[in-house]
Each structure stands twice: as C-alpha cells, then as structure tokens.
Curated annotation (Swiss-Prot):
Alphabetic keyword roster: Metal-binding, Zinc, Zinc-finger
Protein name: Zinc finger protein HVO_2753
Position of sequence motif C(P)XCG motif 1: 12-16
PANTHER family tied to this protein: SMALL ZINC FINGER PROTEIN HVO-2753-LIKE ZINC-BINDING POCKET DOMAIN-CONTAINING PROTEIN, ZINC-RIBBON RNA-BINDING PROTEIN INVOLVED IN TRANSLATION-RELATED
InterPro entries cross-referenced by the UniProt entry: HVO_2753-like (IPR044720), HVO_2753-like_euryarch (IPR049683), HVO_2753-like_ZBP (IPR011668)
Example of a GO MF term: zinc ion binding
Effect of C12A: Not able to complement the deletion mutant of this gene. Loss of swarming. Severe loss of structure and stability
Residue ranges of the motif C(P)XCG motif 4: 51-55
Length: 59
C-alpha cells in the first residue's frame, strides 16, 4: 500500500477527518471492493459517501 493510500485508509471518506483511534466502520465498496472507512458521526447522520476508486455512492 502506498503512503497516499495509507493516509486515505485512516480518513473518513465522507468528511475527511482522521479516524485513527476513533469508533469507525471499514467495509468494502459494493461495486469494486475498495476498502472504505467512515467515522461514527457520518454513519449516524447517514451522510453520503463516494468510493474513491469507482465513484459508487451510498448512504
């Protein structure tokens, strides 16, 4: 994994905050399988997210 990919792996894909050490969910994109991370606040508020690889959007 590149340094850029590692940075993105520890950021909420919805709001961009650093999620290291926080309650967060990490899951695979339903379309392409890319790992996506979201903070608990964005999950609770059902904020939209977009997969950085394929553009899939979900709640």
């Amino acid at each position: 994994m590149s340094e850029s990919e590692q940075r993105h792996a520890h950021q909420c894909v919805s709001c961009g905050i650093n999620i290291a050490g926080m309650s967060a969910a990490t899951f695979k994109c339903p379309d392409c399988g890319q790992e996506i991370s979201r903070c608990s606040k964005c999950r609770k508020q059902s904020n939209l997210y977009e997969c950085p690889d394929c553009g899939f959007m979900g709640p």
